[in-house]
């Protein structure tokens, strides 16, 4: 793959920062106007920590199955949660291999997994949400989809360049 020019690289970094800020707002600060001092104090009490660990979903596909089977939950809410967890991380699957010149798909997918894990741990540790392994699965799937899109685009560009070279 051809080297990315400095201005394009800066633009890609700005996109990554924007994506991370949007994800942080939607994952960590959803529905909050501010993180109060009282919230911080509660977050670090032993009772608060135990409560968050008790609420954490560590069993894969529990939330996904619940959403699939539930008749009482609003369909828009269920789809927004499931699809949002996937779609929100697609840009990372596209941007990470471009910014870090990762040649193998597992590197990009693992990078997305680590970012998702960071968000989930932040929710758990700072009482900003509930840790859910299903979110990790869906976020990582989004990263994989993003990488597949990157790979397809890269293949098309390579093919076009080969054709241009063959013509010249």
Which ranges hold each PLM region?
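Alpha-helical transmembrane segments that form the membrane-embedded catalytic/substrate-binding core
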Residues: 127, 131-150
